[in-house]
Structure formats: structure tokens, C-alpha cells
């Protein structure tokens, strides 16, 4: 919120807009670590392939439950540090602790529990972050703010996927493992993620604090009903009033996210079988498949970043519906051919 409403939010320089979005780098680095490493970690700890989808439930379940609830609660929050900052800080601390502990998980149940904490913490941080951009930037700068956020999304995920390969390039052994069979390069990648998660959020909070609310804005928020019940009713009202276009997109997204989770859960296992002829998580071939997946993940995030820019003129010419259909068809063909 601005000091005097929407029209009085001060314009920020490009450097300030970058600073306020640095925290998104840490969030997305953490998500990239999960996508690229959780299935191998589960396999190192003894999980069989059929149980991987159950072990991955933390991601979609916390996204479904935590994001909308935290978004509604943060809209009603009044604190000395602002409306969004408390969620940033709590989420970043929990995320960092979970990342620190993950590669040292003593058993499968511990890793699964830590993933629930990690995903919940990331969602607690991420949902208010989007509102933070709207609160902090004048309407004319909000598109630039979200574009900068998207750039940090691509940077964070690309670097997280490439970190194990970069560590090998710097001289670490890809075959050195701890007592539970988890490679040391994976452990160090998660430790770096813990550092990035907390430091990037602290950087954004310190360099670009929230604007103070006016007395009228504070009075309006204070008058809102408190507690989980009103927040849930607000979510239900939003779903009931959802535009028809969003309802159509929801059906498409159901199948798109099904495909993406199948990819994240099984791509390392597929590469290990196809390229190295092994399904043994303790084999050198399986660890090499994890490195290959990181390189592929870094590449596809880079391609996604370039494609997002290229799609702007293409969409203007051919229309969003046909471009979207062509992109999903290409993705489906790629997934069909990958194994």
C-alpha cells in the first residue's frame, strides 16, 4: 500500500526494483533444488519407484492449501514490520533450516517430513511476495516489477540445477557420498540454497522496506474480520466469482501440472536407465544421470526465459490460444521421446 493510496507510491529506480526482487532468487533456487534432487534423495534413502508420487505430495498439497490461506491472512495483517515482511522472514528461516537438514536426513520419513516443511515455508514466503510488488510499486512500474521477478525465477532455477555440475567442474568428486549415499555435491548445493534463501530475503527486506500504511488504510484493515474462518470464506468467494476464462485455464493446468510432476519425479530414473543402463541408486551411472538432469534443467530454464520473450510478438500475430496449444504439443512430444 502506498503512503497516500495507489496514486502516491514513489517511483523506484531499476536498481531498487531489482533489490526488492532479489528475495525471489532464493525462493526459486530452493524450488529448483527440490525439482532436481528430491527423487534421487528418496532413492538414496531406500524409496522404491512406485512410492515417489506419494513422497512428492508435499509440493502440490502445500501449494493448494498454504498459498491462498497465507495470501488472505497477509491482507489482514498489521504488524510493526508491515503486512508482508513477517511472512517473508518466517518462511525464509524455516526454508533455510529445512534445506540445511535435508541432505543429512537419517531416514526416508525424515526427508519426506522436511519436504513438507520446505514447501510450506516456500509458499509462505512466495505468496505475499507477489502482493509486495503490487503494494510497493506504482501501477506504471508493476509490469517491470513482475518481469524482474520472472528474471530472478529463471536465474534461481537455472543456477540451482547447474550447481552440482559446477561443483564437479571446480574439482569436487561426483562420486563421493555420505553415510546415507547422498553425494557431497548435493549436500553442498542444499547448504548453498539455505544461505541464498535467508540472505536474499534479508537483502530485499532491508533495501526495500514496505511503505507505511496511512491511518485510513490501517483502520480499514483493522476492521476486517480476523481468523482463519473469514480468510477461508474470502477464498471461497474468489473461487465462486472466478472468471470463465480462468475456469477454462484451470482444466488445462490440471493436466499440465500432472505432466510436470511426472517429469520431475521420474526424469533422473529415466535418464539412468536410458543412458547408463542402471536403476541402482548407489551406482555411478545413477549419480551421473543426476548431473545430466541438472544440465538439462538449467538448459530448459534458459530456453524458457528466451521463449517467454520471443512469444510476445508471436502471440500478437497468431493469438494466445494457438501459441499455447503449439507449446503444449511440443512439450508433450518432448516428454514422449525423453524415456
Question: What would you call each of these model-derived segments?
Answer:
Residues 82, 86-88, 189, 320-326:
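Juxtamembrane helix-start motifs in multi-pass secondary transporters
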Amino acid at each position: 500500500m502506498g503512503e497516500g493510496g495507489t496514486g502516491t507510491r514513489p517511483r523506484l529506480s531499476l536498481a531498487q526494483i531489482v533489490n526488492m526482487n532479489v528475495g525471489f532468487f532464493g525462493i526459486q533456487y530452493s524450488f529448483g533444488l527440490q525439482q532436481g534432487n528430491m527423487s534421487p534423495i528418496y532413492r538414496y534413502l531406500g524409496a522404491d519407484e512406485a512410492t515417489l508420487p506419494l513422497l512428492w505430495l508435499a509440493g502440490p498439497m502445500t501449494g493448494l492449501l498454504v498459498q491462498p490461506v497465507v495470501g488472505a491472512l497477509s491482507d489482514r495483517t498489521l504488524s510493526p514490520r508491515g503486512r508482508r515482511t513477517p511472512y517473508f522472514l518466517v518462511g525464509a528461516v524455516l526454508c533455510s533450516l529445512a534445506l540445511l537438514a535435508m541432505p543429512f536426513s537419517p531416514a526416508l520419513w525424515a526427508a519426506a517430513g522436511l519436504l513438507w516443511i520446505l514447501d510450506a515455508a516456500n509458499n509462505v514466503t512466495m505468496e505475499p511476495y507477489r502482493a509486495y510488488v503490487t503494494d510497493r510499486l506504482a501501477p506504471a512500474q508493476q509490469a517491470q516489477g513482475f518481469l524482474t521477478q520472472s528474471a530472478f525465477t529463471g536465474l534461481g532455477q537455472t543456477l540451482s540445477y547447474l550447481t552440482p555440475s559446477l561443483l564437479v567442474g571446480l574439482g569436487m568428486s561426483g562420486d563421493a557420498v555420505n553415510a546415507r549415499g547422498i553425494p557431497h555435491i548435493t549436500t553442498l548445493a542444499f547448504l548453498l540454497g539455505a544461505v541464498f534463501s535467508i540472505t536474499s530475503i534479508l537483502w530485499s527486506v532491508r533495501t526495500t522496506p514496505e511503505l507505511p500504511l496511512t491511518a485510513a488504510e490501517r483502520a480499514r484493515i483493522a476492521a476486517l474480520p480476523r481468523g482463519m474462518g473469514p480468510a477461508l470464506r474470502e477464498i471461497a468467494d474468489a473461487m465462486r466469482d472466478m472468471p470463465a476464462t480462468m475456469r477454462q485455464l484451470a482444466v488445462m493446468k490440471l493436466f499440465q501440472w500432472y505432466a510436470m510432476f511426472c517429469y520431475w519425479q521420474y526424469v533422473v530414473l529415466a535418464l539412468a536407465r536410458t543412458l547408463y543402463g542402471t536403476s541402482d541408486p548407489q551406482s555411478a551411472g545413477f549419480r551421473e544421470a543426476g548431473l545430466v538432469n541438472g544440465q538439462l534443467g538449467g538448459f530448459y530454464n534458459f530456453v524458457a526465459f528466451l521463449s517467454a520473450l520471443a512469444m510476445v510478438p508471436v502471440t500478437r500475430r497468431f493469438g494466445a490460444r494457438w501459441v499455447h496449444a503449439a507449446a503444449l504439443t511440443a512439450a508433450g512430444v518432448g516428454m514422449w521421446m525423453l524415456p
